[in-house]
Amino acid sequence: MEDDGSLLPEDELLADALLLEDERDELEDPEFDIKCLLQEAEDDVDPGHSSSVKELDTDADKLKKKTAEDRTQAFHLRQNLSALDKMHEEQELFTEKMRGELRACRQRRDLIDKQQEAVAAEIATEEEAGNMAAVGRLQAVSRRLFAELENERDLQSRTEAVLKESENTMWHIEIQEGRLEAFRTADREEVEATGRRLQVRAAEQLCREQEALGKVERNRLLRIRKSLNTQKELGLRHQKLLEDARKNHKVAVRFLKASLGRIREQEKKEEMECHEYMRRRMDAVVALKGSISANRDTLRKFQAWDRAKAELAEQRVQAEKKAILAQGRDAFRHLVHQRRRQELEAQKRAFEEEQKLRKQEIISRILKEEAEEEKRKKQHPPTSARHRLTLRDKTWNYISDFCKKTTVPTNTYTLDYEAAAGPGPSRLLEVVSSELIQGDPGASSEEETLAEPEISGLWNEDYKPYQVPKEDVDRKPVGGTKMDKDILERTVERLRSRVVHKQVVWGREFQGRPFNSKPELLHFQDFDIGKVYKKKITLVNTTYTINYCKLVGVEEHLRDFIHVDFDPPGPLSAGMSCEVLVTFKPMINKDLEGNISFLAQTGEFSVPLKCSTKKCSLSLDKELIDFGSYVVGETTSRTITLTNVGGLGTTFKFLPASEPCEMDDSQSALKLSSLLTYEDKSLYDKAATSFSEQQLEGTESSQADMQSRKELEKLDKEQEEEQPAEPERLTTVIPPSEEQTEITLGEVTEGEIGPFSSIKVPIVFTPVVPGDVQARFKVTFKNPQCPTLHFRVVGVAIDVPVWVPKPSVDLKICMYDRLYQDSVLVHTRSKAALRLKFEVCKELRAHLELLPKTGYIQAQSSYSVQLKFLPRHSLPEDAGRYFDKETRVLEAPMTIWVADQNKPVGFTVHAIVTTSDLELSPSEVDFGYCTIYEAIRTEISLHNHSLLPQEFGFVRLPKFVDVQPNDGFGTILPLETLQFCVIFQPTKAEEHRFQLTCKSEINRCFKLSCRAVGVHPPLELSHYQIKFAATALYDTSVATVYVINSHLSMSSPTHSKPRIGSEDASPMGPTSFEFLLPPDSPITISPSVGTVWPGKRCLVQVAFRPVLPEKLIRQEALPLLNKEMETKSFRKNMAPQRKDLHGLSFSVLRAQNRDKLFKVSVPHVLEMRKRELRPSSDEYQAARATLLRAFQAKFDTFVVPCVVASGDIKDRKGSEPLSFSPHNTLYLELWCPTVAPSVVVTSHKGKTIFNFGDVAVGHRSIKKISIQNVSPEDLALDFSLLNPNGPFVLLNHSSLLRAGGTQVLVLSFSPHESILAQETLDIITKRGTLTLTLMGTGVASMITCSIEGSVLNMGYVIAGESVSSGFKLQNNSLLPIKFSMHLDSLSSTRGRGQQQLPQFLSSPSQRTEVVGTQNLNGQSVFSVAPVKGVMDPGKTQDFTVTFSPDHESLYFSDKLQVVLFEKKISHQILLKGAACQHMMFVEGGDPLDVPVESLTAIPVFDPRHREEAEELRPILVTLDYIQFDTDTPAPPATRELQVGCIRTTQPSPKKPDHPLMVSALLQLRGDVKETYKVIFVAQVLTGP
């Protein structure tokens, strides 16, 4: 059924495809034509509708009759109508606007008339009253109103005129619209008719679409019926196929069984052959071992021989070196050259030997082929092509010629080489050549290739050559007739001369080139490697009559690059032409030249061909640049153009002619090699060793080393020739002078110039010294093929007539808004008076001034100019680039223009402009809220921005403000900042706003705004300062202070009310407070939070408990840790020395230990620094005791804020905090002196933390602690109570401790459970309290196992042998643990579990039992050692598990239990193993057996009987091939099998822990239901 389901979709798809084809055929029938649909739609429409359609058709006919002119006229009329409508709308808007303005104008006139009447009435009233001033004023108002009235009248008249003109325009527009009203109506009707036509057409289209939809629906139903019929037919066909498949399957199974029987027999036979083959292989391996050992001995002899030769050669080299040094020559250079020559000779001899061997190989192959060919010729004599030389014949002729030429020299070289090299290398060469001859796969393939005929089928036995029938053969002589011979000779001669036919017209023979080519020269320029270039040639027939043309080809050296496409056109008349396509694909960057040869009827001709690479063609546009005459100081420039007309770019560089060029890479490398030759003396040893190695390997060099050998010879010759000139070449190049030259190059001096481009380089002429100036330059290029170009530059420098002797005017340091003056002197050397114009740059004209601005200087005289400088604060912005804002330096260029002189005379004004500002920082001081019981101090800074010192002082200070130090007066240096303290102490609650004024010596005032709020808090403290008595470390001092609420009445006039500034007074009632302690302070305040009622006070206790800083204790503990680690390392190093170095003296050992300690101390210190100390550690406690004894008294001060809030703290809801006001804050100052303690611990290095360590639960540990009274008086002791249910108990105590006396306290620790316990014991005296911290840990046993997953798999073992594996148990507790090992197979309760059903029956997922198959001999298959023992704390115990099976099984298992103290089971380890009879095993597949052995099975212990009884065991592998989607291929079914080999107990050099495993991957593709048998054949070899 699954097959049916998988095939049905495919059948449906096929049916759908057929139906779609039928539908496409039906839809393409004529009945679906649009015309037919249109005719049907017209027939179905009602008569009324048809009449409307007819009317529309008549309208359409009328519209069609309109000419193009009518349409154009209608279009223009529509545009005119739209323009008229737009103009009408605009004019209408404009008219309305004008009418509005006219109404407004009339309203203003009415208003002015009324105002005139009112003013006239007032004038009359004032005249009657006699108020002439008012009358005059009113008359002025009347005149103004009259003028306004006149203006309004004028405006009204103008508005009326504009309105009238607008109305006229409106009338004209309406007249034009009236004229076009008829066209507007006709156009509207036409638009409506067009809309009706479109509606009718839409209705027709709808009808046609509905008809088409009906046909589509009918086609769909037809396709459905066809698909149902097709599915029925496919179902019947599929059912028939299934029946046929079942029948075929039965037949196939019958034949398959027979085939499998034959295969089994064949497998048995192959297995026997395999055993025999393995036996032979083992014998070969044994023989190979013997030969390897013999070869090793031979190789050792050769190596000893080579070492002796190398030593002899080294002695000869040293002797030769001494002789050369005695003669005064360079021994190193001589030896290097000599060794190079020897290397080259050795390589040459090796190369010749190799050529000889290769020649012999080739000759032997050719002789072999010749023999085979002769043999074939005897069998099948060739019928044709006897005189044609084959490739093999050509090769044989070449080899024979080569042998004749090189036989004698080769023998001499061979003899010389054998005499010089000795027997060692020759033997190696023989071995290498024999290996090459025997193992070269290319030789066999070549032999096979050469053994085949050139034409397939010639050597086939069934091939018969073609024979001409006897009736077709004429009776002719063997050599042909005489006429045939003459014709043949003439034809051959004509073909050799390549003249086919001489052309003679009118008795005139054509002489010359038969075809002309256009172009005459085919030139491929500037080509790139890899690209393809194509060009066409036109060949024109220049002969007298018809001619032919044939392509012969290109020359030999062009055939790899040039391809000619030429289709012979046939006969060409005179003057006709044909085209030839030439394709050029360059593969080397090289110029090529040649010809393309053609053959015409009258002779041969060729077209020249040229291929040019990219080249540089560089030139300068001029070789001389003449600047002419210029005044000294002026600057001018010219440009020179470098042009590249070639197709290759390069790098250029413009240099002065005197500057040397940079050396190329090759030259630098040559110089470097020469330097190394003369200076690097250490290279001698490297060269000697490399020569000795290369001398041994020289016999194995190949032909590829010939090129490098020739290059080395050339290099040696060049060095020998250039050795005298070498010191000149290695001289240091002096850099060009840094002085300014008059003719220089511009910014662009080097760069890249591309192909077919040009670059302009500027040349700058700046005359400095009068006189003629000239310079030479050169242009160098990186491309060595480009020559260096040279050009020359000349110019003349002329001196100026006017100059300034002081070109720089220094005004020193100037302040803003201060006037500074100076005079500038101008000289002239001219013999005539000159007009001078003094000019200041426009940026500085507001700050600098030169007086006068214009003047005349007499001949050969001087002229003085006044300079005025008044810097303003806008100078940095105005000056721009002339002023440096960082350094405040002004460099102002001044210009003196001289008549008839191009270059002006300039001088510079230098000044350092600084400000006189003093800056107070911050700009505003806010003291905030300050109570009347305190003073607030804040710091301000005064910064001098000037570069000059200034005196200052704070003046007119308020009474409640003070400035310190020196009461705010002093002198501030340039750019200095002074710090001042401003102290503010209010006397009453109000807001304060005031200014601090700082006045400088130049009477400039700088003000600082200050503000503050005086606060009268509702609470006050009894005293604001507490001085504690001297308190010992880790002791406590307590002081009391009262918080008072003195606010009793809201209406008391004599007392000030609590308030914040000028706010309302605080409400009377309960007031709460809270003290905020600073972090990490030794202060404790109780209560820190409280409420005080009006007229009441609250007592507060302040406790002071000083302790040592944590950081200081850790610093003190670090040396102790370092010392302890050094002691441990010293003991560790001394232990082996005492055993091994008894004979050495004590001083030697001490020196060695000191060195070792010094080396080890550094890492230990770093390790201890990284280690984190705990307060309970011994080092920490010892360091604290040391610091306590050495503690020096100290004094600290703390300020504790107390915040105040209105209300009772009890009234708050839950944990809701009160709204404390930050302004009503009181401050309490504490003075805290600290001294050393009076009672200290003398035992345990003075530590106060005592750790009893790890104590087993139920055990008891006791410690004794000694305390001492270090004070000068006796002290009474009192002890705090310990937890009565806790593990700590104080066993003794005393009530008095004498001065300097010591007492021992005895403490015990008895844990009842595994916990970490800690308590404190306080020893109380009148001078302080000593606190002892007691710690201890109750420990339970705990171990860990090294086996992960609690499963130990012993793997596969050959039955009868054993294998061992180990694991470790580690004691992680701090106590020794007693352990014992138990196996479940040896347990007494094992028999109870065997009475139940087997595991594979009750639980299919878990097939095996915990205790699996056991040995048949009664011994346990698993054993463990040791069985019992004790593990020390932190130690590891090794255990060995031995697996010894006596028969084959895959289900050996057992469970190992680790029991502690014979009670507690700590770990359970599952032991597994498998045993096989053979060394090979296979894992994987489906199980075919059960994990429980049958009791009826009788083991076979005899190997001979076992082999007879043994059968092949099948492995069931089930592969599920699932295909989810028919469209996509499903992934192959995959199962993995592992084939392994078991190591035997035979001794071997290396024995790995796990067997060799090989995975066999089985894949199944396709729909396969048969069962296959896969046989694994493997070979067991002895491996390392």
From Swiss-Prot:
Residues 692-739 are annotated as: Disordered. One of its GO terms (biological process) is axoneme assembly. Disulfide bonds: none annotated. Keywords: Cell projection, Ciliopathy, Cilium, Coiled coil, Cytoplasm, Cytoskeleton, Disease variant, Flagellum, Primary ciliary dyskinesia. Gene3D superfamilies: Immunoglobulins. Residues 707-717 have a biased composition (Basic and acidic residues). Residues 692-706 have a biased composition (Polar residues). It is found in: Cytoplasm, Cytoskeleton, Cilium axoneme; Cytoplasm, Cytoskeleton, Flagellum axoneme. The keyword Coiled coil applies. Residues 300-379 form a coiled coil. Changing R218W: In CILD49; uncertain significance. It comes from the Eukaryota. Its main location: cytoplasm. InterPro entries: Ig-CFAP74_2nd, Ig-CFAP74_3rd, Ig-CFAP74_4th, Ig-like_fold. It holds the Pfam family Ig-CFAP74_4th. GO terms for cellular component: axoneme; cytoplasm; nucleus; sperm flagellum. Belongs to the CFAP74 family. As part of the central apparatus of the cilium axoneme may play a role in cilium movement. May play an important role in sperm architecture and function. It is linked to Ciliary dyskinesia, primary, 49, without situs inversus: A form of primary ciliary dyskinesia, a disorder characterized by abnormalities of motile cilia. Respiratory infections leading to chronic inflammation and bronchiectasis are recurrent, due to defects in the respiratory cilia. CILD49 is an autosomal recessive form without situs abnormalities. Affected males also show infertility due to defective flagellar morphology and function. This is Cilia- and flagella-associated protein 74. It comes from Homo sapiens (Human). The gene is CFAP74.
